[in-house]
């Protein structure tokens, strides 16, 4: 069980020059990659680390709001406006841990949901936006890096893509 300070410090250590699998041997070190990207951006702009944790929390909050908005937009036709709104609010307020930070469990959950939303939108909107597949794959990779056991979800996603491709509506890359 990790706490917010530990999760934050992993990304900070990468920004300051520690190297994965060389100077860092924590079991959660790969979950430091997204936090390190956000921290590097913040320190490059601000020139200091003062306020960095608040910035990371704000980025997570904005990402959660965007995912919730996409969820609402994509599911309001299927489950109705009220059901989609309630579900989107639950998605927004749900936090796998007690803090809004860059820990591996939160990353695994949010990146998996983001990958699902990308693939779902790509499928339901007629395979017209291939960049969503790329974005979904990047989100899935971050999910797998944050919590390597979640790579088992790749098999489920792949089977889903194959089954959707067999319906005859998908691109030939999904047909097996």
Task: Give the role of each language-model region.
Residues 1-6:
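Helix-to-loop transition at the C-terminal end of transmembrane segments
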Residues 8-12, 23-48, 143:
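Short hydrophobic/aromatic helix or loop-helix immediately within or flanking a transmembrane segment
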Residues 31, 35-42, 55-70, 108-111:
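Transmembrane alpha-helices of multi-pass, membrane-embedded glycan-processing enzymes
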Residues 66-93:
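Transmembrane-helix signature of polytopic, membrane-embedded enzymes
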Residues 77-79, 113-133, 165-168:
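Membrane-interface transmembrane helices that cradle and orient dolichyl/undecaprenyl
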Residues 96, 131-148, 154-161:
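Membrane-interface alpha helices of multi-pass inner-membrane proteins
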Residues 100-109:
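Short acidic/glycine- and proline-prone juxtamembrane loop motifs at membrane-interface regions
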Residues 124, 153-176:
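Perimembrane helix-loop-helix junctions
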């Amino acid at each position: 069980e990790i706490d917010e300070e530990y999760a934050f410090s992993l990304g900070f250590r990468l920004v300051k020059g520690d190297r994965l699998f060389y100077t860092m041997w924590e079991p959660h070190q790969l979950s430091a990659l997204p936090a390190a990207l956000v921290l590097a951006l913040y320190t490059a702009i601000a020139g200091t680390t003062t306020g960095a944790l608040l910035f990371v929390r704000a980025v997570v909050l904005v990402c959660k709001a965007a995912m919730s908005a996409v969820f609402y937009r994509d599911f309001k036709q299927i489950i109705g406006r009220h059901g989609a709104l309630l579900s989107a609010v639950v998605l927004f307020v749900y936090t796998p841990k007690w803090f809004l930070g860059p820990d591996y469990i939160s990353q695994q959950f949010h990146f998996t949901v983001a990958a699902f939303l990308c693939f779902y939108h790509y499928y339901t909107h007629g395979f017209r936006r291939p960049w969503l597949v790329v974005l979904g794959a990047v989100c899935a990779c971050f999910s797998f890096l944050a919590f390597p056991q979640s790579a088992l979800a790749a098999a489920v996603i792949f089977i889903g893509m194959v089954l959707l491709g067999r319906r005859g509506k998908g691109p030939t890359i999904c047909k097996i």
